Amino acid sequence: MTLGGLTITAQAIELANKMSDQFVQGAGDGLLGLAFGQINTVTPTPVATPVENMISQDSIPASAELFTAKLGSWRDANEPDKGESFYTFGFIDDATVTASGQEVKYAPVDNSQGFWMFDSTSATVNGTSVAQSGNTAIADTGTTLALVSDDTCKAIYDAIPGSTYDQANQGYTFPSNTTADQLPVVTFAVGDTQFAVQKEDLGFADAGNGMVYGGIQSRGSMTFDILGDTFLKGIYAVSPLAHVDDGLANIV
């Protein structure tokens, strides 16, 4: 398997027996998992993940056993990179960090469940804190939305004029003519640092009848938040394997 300029030998690839209509209609033709190997479901013998193989095959240096993710956005369509996304394996893109005007901030990660899980004990909406004692979250590029507690969802959409819970779409919506200055500043804690969701990512898709389906929705019965692409589009994520930290720098 080849990823950019890296070749991974003897990489196991699972074949799907059934695919959703949404997946079939998408532009991609596969899913690259970047979680930890302990959630591997291959039977009878688990296999190494792509990143584990990169490390064991010395495709990335021992001094930089990490990967990074920068998810592009439509807001950058007029930029030189056209808003394209990228991953790096084995190095941090210093130009992206420099452009953010910030240093990478690291938070301890609990990988006991196989996820990039960290403490996320608060959120803010227009500067007002929403306490989430004992709360944890995972960063997941494979999840489109940000999925958070009901209390946090309510605080966010209470701050957007005309927002409502749409029973038909099973989620919060708000008027499509909502201007940027009417949208709240929303941040989520990653360890001790708050990171903002870009306002243009608060809306996900057209919900009809002049409404937009929100990019942040309820996590339902899950006991942790999933900070997916809605959140990740606003940051540059650095994920070291060796010391199990998760590093984030705001993108501006």
Please report, for each region that a protein language model flagged, where it lies by residue:
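Short hydrophobic beta-strand that contains or immediately precedes a catalytic carboxylate
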Residues: L31-L32, A137-T141, L147, I226-L227, ...
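Non-catalytic N-lobe/flap surface of aspartyl protease domains
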Residues: M1-S100, A155-A189, G210-D225
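Flexible, small-/acidic-enriched active-site or ligand-binding loops
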Residues: K82-G134, F204
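Structural motif
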Residues: L3, T124-N126, T141, V190, ...
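Conserved beta-strand elements of beta-rich interaction domains across eukaryotes
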Residues: S20, G37-I39, I92-D94, T143-T144, ...
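Aspartic protease catalytic domain
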Residues: K18, A180-V252
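Active-site beta-strand/loop microenvironment that shapes enzyme catalytic pockets
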Residues: T128, Q132-A159
